[in-house]
A protein has these predicted regions:
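A charged, aromatic-enriched C-terminal amphipathic alpha-helix characteristic of glycosyltransferases
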Residues: 371-401
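Conserved donor-binding/catalytic core segment of Leloir-type glycosyltransferases
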Residues: 222-243, 249-252
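Membrane-proximal helix-turn-helix segments that form the acceptor-binding/catalytic region
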Residues: 96, 136, 148-182, 195-200
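Short alpha-helical donor nucleotide-sugar binding micro-motif in glycosyltransferases
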Residues: 296-301
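Short hydrophobic beta-strand element within catalytic cores of glycosyltransferases
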Residues: 326-329, 339
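Aromatic "clamp/platform" in nucleotide-sugar-dependent glycosyltransferases that forms part
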Residues: 309
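Nucleotide-activated donor-binding/catalytic signature segment of Leloir-type glycosyltransferases, i.e.
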Residues: 269-292
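Conserved acidic donor-binding segment of nucleotide-sugar-dependent glycosyltransferases
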Residues: 341-342, 346-353, 362-368
């Protein structure tokens, strides 16, 4: 079997969740002895069978960026005030490469930044799998619809602009012609696909993203400390609005002063000077590129704060649990999937920051109880390994490829 992945970036260092997940899948397939190729616009680390298109240094690459960035950026100067991908421009050189590789499956990952033209994608002759890292393929413009239900009920001249109707119809034609299989990393995102007008005729399988085997619980990595370590991390850290740091701030403000004094907030994914957040000492760890270094942080922390507003899975949540770290999350989109409330962490109602603070207090009490135990952390790690083990997930993906 030969598989070709298509995505915007390749690599695991500060590239975003979709690129990290796709890179790990590519590497895992290669390790299993399956011929896997990765086609991307930007290669951010060395890798086997990675193809950068349009070719670096070529005139075609310059034209590609001029056209895609120009078309996407034009909308910033209109009433939309933001970039809007149109996916009109083809990825130069893709047809020639696919004819040479002759894949059995093309696995489409994150193409939101005009990576590939929809017409070009529709003409791929082999089986196509689309990974729902977000809802870009089945929504109108935004990667997450929020409260907008038009992706379920449809667009009309009364509820949508010409641009929205045009984009929606292009995606509808693409999916109907391509008839892809959807893989979503959570039940929530697959349910969204099944309910959507664009994706309701396609099969959708809920299969988690593959997580690096470096993430596992190691008691010897636990540091002896007299602080309560709250870990938070995301691409761009606090500045990423979808990760919900504002809600975490509110929850921290509700902690008793005694707990604030004995707590530290560690933030990875952002470079900044150390400070205090609502009375809690805050330490910035920058971009953590190595999975083993990130696993060390998970093992050293006492709780992982996961206040995300919208997620199709939330890889940091799973990485934390594989390292035996309890997670506190809001029950919104797929943020809480995989957490067993009161056993492997705490799930609180969407936006209930007071309950989020209570979860932090409960874990604080557990850590500083008279007889703290590793039993909970072992239980979390074991359960996460059962749910998110690399071998089991890869086998499920291969079943989809072969079906």
């Amino acid at each position: 079997m030969t598989v070709v992945h298509i995505g915007y970036k390749y690599g695991q260092n500060n590239t975003g969740g979709a690129a990290i997940a796709a890179t790990r899948l590519h590497k895992t397939l290669l390790a299993r002895g399956i011929e896997s190729h990765y086609v991307c616009v930007w290669q951010c680390e060395d890798g086997k069978n990675v193809h950068v298109l349009p070719r670096i240094g070529s005139v075609a690459r310059q034209l590609y960026f001029f056209a895609t960035r120009g078309l996407r950026g034009f909308w910033k100067f209109t009433r939309w005030r933001k970039s809007i991908p149109l996916n009109i421009i083809p990825m130069f050189g893709l047809e020639k490469l696919l004819n040479k590789i002759r894949p059995d499956v093309v696995h489409v990952h994150w193409i939101n930044a005009d990576v590939i033209g929809f017409n070009q994608l529709a003409n791929i002759k082999c089986k196509v799998v689309v990974n729902l890292h977000d809802l870009f393929m089945i929504n109108i413009i935004e990667p997450y619809p929020g409260i907008d239900q038009r992706y379920i009920h449809g667009v009309t001249s009364e509820n949508s602009s010409f641009l929205e109707r045009w984009l929606f119809k292009r995606k509808l034609r693409l999916v109907h012609k391509l008839n892809p299989v959807f893989i979503g990393p959570s039940k929530w995102v697959c349910d969204c696909a099944r309910k959507s007008i664009i994706g309701n005729s396609c099969r959708a399988y809920a299969i988690p993203n593959i997580i690096d085997c470096a993430f596992r619980y190691k008691p010897e990595m636990r540091l002896q400390h007299d602080k309560f370590i709250i870990l938070f991390g995301a691409y761009a850290g606090r500045r990423n609005p979808s990760k919900g740091f504002v809600d975490l701030e509110k929850a921290l403000s509700m902690l008793p002063e005694k707990i604030k004094d004995k707590s530290e907030l560690w933030i990875f994914g952002e470079e900044a000077n150390d400070c205090r957040t609502r009375g809690v000492k805050t330490k910035f760890l920058g971009n953590v590129s190595s999975p083993s270094n990130l696993a060390t942080l998970y093992n050293q922390a006492d709780v992982f704060a996961f206040p995300s507003v919208q997620e199709t899975q939330g890889m940091t949540k799973i990485e934390a649990m594989l390292c035996g770290l309890p997670v506190i999350a809001f029950d919104r989109t797929a943020c809480a999937e995989g957490i067993e409330n009161g056993v492997t962490g705490w799930v609180v109602n969407a936006g209930d920051v007071k309950a989020f603070a209570v979860g932090l207090i409960k874990q604080y009490d557990e850590v500083f109880s008279s007889c703290p135990s590793d039993e909970m952390r072992w239980k979390i790690a074991k359960r996460a390994k059962t749910m998110f083990g690399e071998y089991e997930i890869l086998n499920r993906i291969l079943e989809v490829y072969r079906a």
